[in-house]
């Protein structure tokens, strides 16, 4: 996995501060704070750490942790890496501004197969609208007043308009959608781990359910090009952070050298040093053995007192 991305680059935008705001529709959204500053970074630089953090946010929900704990973890992830880019991840193309309408494959969040562009944009700009004019397949977008936003727009002029728009401070993503995506990734990981751990103890019908669940995991492969930097470098054209995480997670999921594992004690996702790694740390291993020993002793005491 490391070899695949060692000579690779990409880019995404994150802000230094995010907040959760409630819109007029009563829904909660994650959005940059009004004075937050953007930062352009390479998400492939620390890709294993990013995927692990995403999976562990999802595991908090799988393990039914309190909502305030989940909320804090989601905001922490977004501050580290930025929003997921759902606006460009969901349609059939990130260049949907070049078409008369937005076309959507089947997904968790939007039932419609197509939407008017203005209605679709409204899902991601619930507070302040961008100055966008849409007439048929023609689109224009005016950015003025905020020099930082103008500079950000100019930086990504060669990108699809919608991707560029999603880097603006006004952009927001529904909190429930973001949370669900993290949970979906954690579900995919646990499905894979349980399938192999329980293979001999489950029947064929259950195995088929696991296989179908895994078959549903996938995505559109991102495009790439080669840039001549200090040396030839693969540059991945991720039009959403979601797609980048999905691809990196996929490669990590099939990596035998450093397999993704769930800690037997704390349920934290970690990269194992070998296929049968069971604990994320020596501390967790020791605590697990202590609790296991105490459980045995209690059982023996009960038998002695019977």
Where are these regions (language model features)?
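Short helix-coil boundary/hinge micro-motifs
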Residues: 1-270
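BZIP DNA-binding basic region
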Residues: 245-306
């Amino acid at each position: 996995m490391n070899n695949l991305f060692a000579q690779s680059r990409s880019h995404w935008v994150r802000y230094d501060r995010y907040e959760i705001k409630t819109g007029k529709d009563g829904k909660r959204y994650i959005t940059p704070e009004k004075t937050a500053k953007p930062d352009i970074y390479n998400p492939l630089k620390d890709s294993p750490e990013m995927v692990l953090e995403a999976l562990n946010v999802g595991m908090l929900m799988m393990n039914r942790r309190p909502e305030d704990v989940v909320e804090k973890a989601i905001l922490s992830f977004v501050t580290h890496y930025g929003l997921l880019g759902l606006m460009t991840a969901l349609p059939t193309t990130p260049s949907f501004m070049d078409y008369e309408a937005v076309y959507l494959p089947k997904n968790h969040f939007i039932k419609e197969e197509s939407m008017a562009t203005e209605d679709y944009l409204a899902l991601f700009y619930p507070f302040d609208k961008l100055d966008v004019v849409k007439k048929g397949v023609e689109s224009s977008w005016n950015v003025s007043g905020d020099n930082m936003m103008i500079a950000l727009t100019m930086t990504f002029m060669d990108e699809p308009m919608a991707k560029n728009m999603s880097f603006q401070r006004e952009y927001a993503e529904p909190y429930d959608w973001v949370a669900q995506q993290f949970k979906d990734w954690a579900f995919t990981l646990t499905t894979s781990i349980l399938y192999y751990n329980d293979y001999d103890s489950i029947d064929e019908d259950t195995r088929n359910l696991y296989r179908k669940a895994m078959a549903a995991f996938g995505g559109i492969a991102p495009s790439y090009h080669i840039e001549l930097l200090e040396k030839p470098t693969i540059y991945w054209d991720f039009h959403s952070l979601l797609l980048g995480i999905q691809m990196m997670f996929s490669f990590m999921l099939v990596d035998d050298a450093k397999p993704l594992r769930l800690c037997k004690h704390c349920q934290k996702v970690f990269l194992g040093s070998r296929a049968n790694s069971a604990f994320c740390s020596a501390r967790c291993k020791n605590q697990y053995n202590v609790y296991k020993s105490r459980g045995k002793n209690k059982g023996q005491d009960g038998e002695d007192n019977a």
